[in-house]
């Protein structure tokens, strides 16, 4: 009985994590859905544990509303670098990815990580795969 009462006290996000199959959720299906640039609502919350956030271009919001289009969804992908250090090859790959899939910026943070912005849903998988290939990670 104690476990049930504690379970009820969990936040909505904790309930989503609890039923997510080790943070998998339905992210795979969300990424395959060609009808929208967004992820399913529960997956939007889960991807932060994979080092990414769903965003949209606010500058285009009113123009897209007038045309009855959904917001221009895009993603921020965070790359962890132990001690904030990368090899020259890792740096070159991150720079290439920012040009190829992002909005041509690579942000350095005060938390020893890098951020790509403007990644479209269809480019999330190849971006993260390439990050992993050079032995870096997006996991939070």
Predicted regions and their residues:
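Feature of Fe-S/electron-transfer and energy-metabolism proteins
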Residues: 1-140
């Amino acid at each position: 009985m104690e476990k049930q009462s504690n379970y009820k006290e969990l936040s909505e996000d904790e309930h989503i994590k609890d039923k997510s199959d080790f943070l998998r959720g339905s992210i795979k299906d969300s990424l395959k859905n060609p009808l929208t640039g967004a992820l399913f609502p529960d997956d939007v919350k889960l991807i932060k544990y994979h080092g990414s956030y769903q965003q949209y271009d606010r500058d285009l919001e009113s123009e897209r509303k007038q045309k009855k289009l959904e917001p221009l969804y895009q993603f921020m992908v965070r790359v962890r670098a132990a001690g904030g250090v990368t090899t020259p090859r890792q740096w070159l790959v991150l720079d290439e990815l920012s040009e190829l899939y992002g909005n041509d910026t690579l942000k350095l943070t005060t938390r020893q990580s890098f951020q790509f912005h403007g990644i479209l849903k269809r480019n999330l998988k190849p971006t993260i795969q390439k990050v992993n290939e050079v032995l870096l990670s997006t996991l939070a």
